[in-house]
Amino acid sequence: MNNSYTLSPCRGFTLIELLVVVLIIGILSAVALPQYTKAVEKARATEALSITSNIVNAVETTILSSGVYDSAVYADPENWDISLSGGYWQDSGCCGPMYVTKNFFYLTREDMTGVGAYRCKGTCTGNINDESIYDLWRCYPSVDGEKCLLCFSQTEQGKDICKSLTSLGVEYRP
């Protein structure tokens, strides 16, 4: 009886083949990750544009239905017919009511010029002094006589986002 075992020839991957696969995955990641990050931020900005539109429409509707064109209408979200989720209202301490979400705070100006959406670095704390990556601004049509939608930024990341939003009708102002 023969107790010797014969090994069947097994062939695995060579080190070079494994390195090539890792290199290809690295290159794909380096190309895809910035595009993915940009797409996620553009989606966040689109959500902010939707919320600013809802706030502007609620204020404009309140003005038209009440016939009152006064800063008191702008100063109190209780006057508006609006339902927003994912955040909370608070007093900004300087400029009017503020709606705070995880990524943005929205400021409705008592000077009746419009609604700003400020993209916080990190999680928003509800502090008016939170540093922003970029700012979106939507004017009240009844005040300005036209619809305006602007994006401002002091950071390179924010400038790139502002430029990518021009396809949505946002005017970039450096």
What do the predicted segments below correspond to?
Residues I16, I24-I27, I51, I55, ...:
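Weak global preference for isoleucine
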Residues A30, P34-W80:
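Conserved hydrophobic/amphipathic alpha-helical signal-anchor segments
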Residues S66-P174:
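Periplasmic/extracellular, small/polar-rich flexible segments of pilin-like filament-forming proteins
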Residues M1-S8:
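N-terminal secretory signal peptides that target proteins for export/translocation
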